[in-house]
A protein has these predicted regions:
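Intrinsically disordered, low-complexity, charged terminal extensions of DNA damage-control enzymes
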Residues: 1-128
């Protein structure tokens, strides 16, 4: 039988060659792993969470990830941010990660794939 399908939007916030990652709650999928934030409204999230305005927003093709009980369609939204405000220093459960550096911990597989794709875009290459 067909597995149920769930959908989510993930923000791939990029600033100064780094991407914003959050540690997921211990319970639930990818418990305790680092991931891109799942959001409802991207612009709102940028303003509230990053205290920043998105300069450029790009919607990527949906990425499907299969779990044993359901499929998850991830809609990645790449958001370029001009400057990282002091409000979002690295906290225990969020960090600015530079691809190529040692990761802060375990990273969810589809997130790792998205980071690799991002690493090959001009957004991140120009800073290396």
């Amino acid at each position: 039988k067909e597995k149920p399908l769930r959908e989510t939007t993930m923000v791939l916030a990029v600033a100064d060659g780094a991407v914003y990652l959050e540690r997921r709650p211990a319970s639930g999928i990818w418990g305790g792993l680092w991931s891109f934030p799942e959001v409802g409204d991207v612009g709102e999230w940028c303003a509230e969470q990053l205290n920043a305005e998105a300069i450029a927003v790009e919607n990527w093709d949906t990425l499907r990830h299969s779990f044993s009980h359901y499929d998850l369609d991830i809609a990645p939204v790449v958001v370029r941010i001009d400057a990282v405000s002091s409000k979002v220093a690295d906290y225990d459960d969020s960090t600015w990660y530079r691809p190529g550096d040692a990761p802060p911990g375990g990273i969810a597989a589809p997130v790792m794939r998205l980071i690799e794709t991002l690493s090959n875009t001009d957004e991140l290459r120009n800073h290396g």
